[in-house]
Swiss-Prot record:
CDD domains: NAD_bind_Glutamyl_tRNA_reduct (cd05213)
Assembly and oligomerization: Homodimer.
Protein's organism: Sulfurihydrogenibium sp. (strain YO3AOP1)
UniProt-annotated site: Important for activity, residues: H100
Entries under InterPro entries matching the protein: 4pyrrol_synth_GluRdtase (IPR000343), 4pyrrol_synth_GluRdtase_dimer (IPR015896), 4pyrrol_synth_GluRdtase_N (IPR015895), GluRdtase_dimer_dom_sf (IPR036453), GluRdtase_N_sf (IPR036343), NAD(P)-bd_dom_sf (IPR036291), Shikm_DH/Glu-tRNA_Rdtase (IPR006151)
Keyword Oxidoreductase: yes
Identification of the protein by name: Glutamyl-tRNA reductase
Function, in words: Catalyzes the NADPH-dependent reduction of glutamyl-tRNA(Glu) to glutamate 1-semialdehyde (GSA).
Record-stated family: Belongs to the glutamyl-tRNA reductase family.
GO molecular function: glutamyl-tRNA reductase activity; NADP binding
Length: 441
């Protein structure tokens, strides 16, 4: 059994690749079902945000086959060739996979360390995977632990104090270029979480007015009302462009919303520069817009510079958080390693119990005069003897399994009994392990 984490994020793949891999709400179930149908995968969960498309799962030891199948499915979905995806794919197993998952849930792997959005996104991805019955007991345990680690880090370090989001980074970039924003009109296209965060930060800087547009007009009205703004119908965006000084685009559209010709017409009646920040993935503003004079277009990857300038004060707290991660990873790895030998121990105990039953049956035939109470006393004595005999080797093998690098002793223990039972049957280990995890929970 192998725990793995794989995928593409802002560190490994540019936005041009990530936007093609981004999994929409409508496609999520289809992709998850395809991944879950891979024979070598036992459990799978997918998280798709503007900064990452990642898969966390449990599989058998055939890792290369797992990687190959994942790439094939993602290539079909994104239309990006497998060989191209290979260049940007990361793939971690076991200890490093667990570490990565803990770092993601704790926002230590985020573009903006300490940003809170990832926790909700992490929970949502797990909830969806549960709905599609793609996760079972191992990933459930891992995700619960990851969220506990995240909470521990947020409460015991200052990692989330003054934490900035991508939306806030966008606002800081606007402030850096314009200086005072009090006389600036802002158009926000989109009404989701990122758009609302941007509106919140802009409102706190006393911009002149906030306009909100969304395909669902009611959502635009709802968001605009929160910040004393105005809602604009989606089909009227082009008419309003000349009035906007700052445009922040954050939608889930698959095609560009703002095109070069639209912006070109808008700037003809403007004297001041137009500042556009596209924090959507896929990008919602045509890249060629940046060719227009007086127009400044930035996408989500451009925000890295703004983000990096705000990371210094979090470095010390991040180091403290990494120590917590290291500690919790070791605990989980020990639990997992000990768990892996549980089917072996269970089979050994089953073998011992069958021997007990055989010997009792033989004994009772030889001593038919024993009454029920006497038989129960003998049975109890044999059970007690077996438990005492197996206790020390069981604890020894669990301890050796929990410590990395002690697989030889475990292998010897397994081989001693493998002639009686095949521990390597497909699915047998997983089912027994899950039973044990279920009992612990």
């Amino acid at each position: 059994m192998v725990i793995f984490s794989t995928g593409f994020n802002y560190k490994t793949a540019p936005v041009e690749i990530r936007e093609k891999l981004a999994i929409t709400e409508n496609n999520y179930g289809l992709i998850l079902e395809k991944l879950n149908s891979i024979e070598d995968i036992y459990e799978i969960c997918v998280i798709s945000t503007c900064n990452r498309v990642e898969l966390y799962g449990v599989s058998n030891d055939n890792i290369e086959k797992v990687k190959e199948e994942i790439l094939r499915i993602l290539s079909q979905y994104s239309t990006v060739p497998v060989n191209t995806l290979k260049d940007y794919l990361f793939f971690y197993t076991n200890k490093e996979a667990i570490r990565h998952i803990f770092r993601v849930s704790s926002s230590l792997d985020s573009m903006v360390i300490g940003e809170p959005q990832i926790v909700c996104q992490f929970k949502d991805s797990f909830t969806k995977a549960k709905e599609y019955k793609a996760v079972r007991h191992i990933l459930t345990r891992l995700f619960d632990k990851a969220l506990n680690v995240s909470k521990k880090i947020r409460t015991s370090t200052g990692i989330s104090r003054r934490a900035v989001s991508i939306s806030y980074a966008a606002v800081l970039l606007a402030k850096k270029i314009f200086g005072d924003l009090k006389d600036k009109n802002v158009l926000i296209i989109g009404a989701g979480e990122m758009a609302e965060l941007a509106a919140k930060h802009l409102h706190s800087l006393n911009v002149k007015h906030i306009f909100v547009s969304n395909r669902t007009f009611e959502k635009a009205v709802e968001l605009a009302d929160k910040f004393s703004g105005s809602a604009i119908r989606f089909e009227k965006i082009q008419e309003f462009l000349p009035e906007a000084d700052i445009i922040i685009v954050s939608t889930g559209a698959k095609e560009p919303i703002l095109k070069k010709e639209d912006v070109k017409r808008a700037i003809k009646s403007r004297k001041d520069p137009l500042f556009i920040i596209d924090i959507s993935v896929p990008r919602n503003v045509e890249e060629s817009v940046n060719e227009l004079e007086g127009v400044y277009l930035y996408n989500i990857d451009d925000l890295k510079q703004v983000v990096n300038s705000n990371l210094e004060e979090r470095k010390i707290e991040a180091q403290r958080a990494e120590f917590i991660i290291d500690e919790e990873v070791e605990k989980f790895v020990k639990w997992l390693n000990a768990l892996k030998v549980s089917p072996i121990i269970s089979s050994v105990r089953d073998y011992a119990d069958k021997l007990r039953q055989q010997q009792l049956e033989k004994l009772f035939k030889q001593m038919p005069y024993l009454n029920e109470k006497e038989r129960e006393t003998i049975d109890l004595a044999m059970r007690s003897l077996i438990n005492k005999l197996l206790h020390r080797p069981t604890m020894y093998i669990k301890d050796k399994a929990a410590k990395e690098g002690n697989t030889e002793v475990v292998k010897i223990f397994e081989d001693m009994f493998s002639s009686k039972w095949d521990f390597r049957k497909k699915g047998k280990n997983l089912e027994e392990i899950e039973d044990i995890v279920r009992e612990e929970q």
